Amino acid sequence: MAGKTVTRADLSEAVYHQVGLSRTESAALVETVLSEICSCLASGETVKLSSFGSFVVRSKGKRVGRNPKTGVEVAIEPRQVMVFKPSNVLKAKINGLNGAGEHDDD
């Protein structure tokens, strides 16, 4: 799956091949997991997936921004933002390192 955008359908297909559930069950499983993550984040909870990372909802306060074209100040209202913080394991995997901080010889 490298080099492209992975969709829900791609995740469902991967579950189908690797776990052995039917395509319908695989799609339902992926949908349920994503729905649960969304529900938790919408209620302000942190979602932590071991060896993957954490999804955290943070509050941003009111501030003054500026229109880059006109220079006019614009009030930016307080809001909630979602932040993803990858685990060290995921960072190492992305950078081609194994758990000991050494490059894999693939």
Curated annotation (Swiss-Prot):
Family that this chain belongs to: Belongs to the bacterial histone-like protein family.
Keywords: DNA recombination, DNA-binding, Transcription, Transcription regulation, Translation regulation
Record-level GO cellular component terms: cytosol
Record's protein name: Integration host factor subunit alpha
SMART domains: BHL (SM00411)
Summary of the function given for this chain in its UniProt record: This protein is one of the two subunits of integration host factor, a specific DNA-binding protein that functions in genetic recombination as well as in transcriptional and translational control.
PANTHER family linked: DNA-BINDING PROTEIN HU, INTEGRATION HOST FACTOR SUBUNIT ALPHA
Transmembrane annotation, as ranges: none
Quaternary state and interactors: Heterodimer of an alpha and a beta chain.
Gene: ihfA
One MF annotation (Gene Ontology) recorded for this entry: structural constituent of chromatin
Pfam name, any one: Bac_DNA_binding
InterPro entries found in the cross-reference section: Hist_DNA-bd, Histone-like_DNA-bd_CS, IHF-like_DNA-bd_dom_sf, IHF_alpha
Biological process, per Gene Ontology: DNA recombination; positive regulation of metabolic process; regulation of DNA-templated transcription; regulation of translation
